[in-house]
Amino acid sequence: MPELIRPSTILPANRSLISIKTSDGLNLIGEVATPLGEITGSLLMLHPNPSGGGMMDSHIYKKAANRLPAMAGIQIIRFNTRGTQSEMGKSEGEYDHGKSERLDVLAAVEYCFERLKTNNLYVIGWSFGTELALQYARDKRIKELILLSPPMLSTTDEDLDFWIKDGRQITALIPELDDYLRPDAANSKFSKVKNLKQIDVVGAKHLWVGEPMVHLVLSEIVKIIAPSRLPLPQEI
């Protein structure tokens, strides 16, 4: 008899611990979850702010790694930025408020292309991770950006100007009840970024708590990377 997908559900994938070396000599811990079959695309995940408990195991990211390789053929790459700790361990270095984390993002992107030989790489940021994505995930080989709950606290107009000129697609999921940037403010902030698709999510909050919100976020990810795999199952 089929069972409902639950927060604890872990579907089959090849999972391996990784160590990413930064240009300033730090080792960052992470995990790659690779589909057992065809890879439809790869997704590098930039986590929320570690000063508020953000890490590679933040719930949306862990559930994506537990489900999307099997459900959608998506390879998931997660890692802890410098000084960040999760169940798998702690990355070397110290949290630097998004400054030295630039080197972490650059190293992780390079790891995807050089070590994993990624062909179709997408980058997702959540909260603090959206700032890292918009500021540092600019490698021309990256296909698109996905933003969850972007607070837009440190991303500048100059950063947005880069993406306006660059033209690559950006998708931003904006919670109706966000703590930092709600839909109307996001519309204003992103008004000049014509290549940004804003999706306003009724009833959502900054942390996307609850299985309905998890399913929605994962479905939007799959719609971008592997649309033929929709709809995502809600039971197995």
Give residue ranges: language-model regions:
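Gly/Ala-rich beta-loop-alpha elbow adjacent to hydrolase catalytic centers
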Residues: 124-133
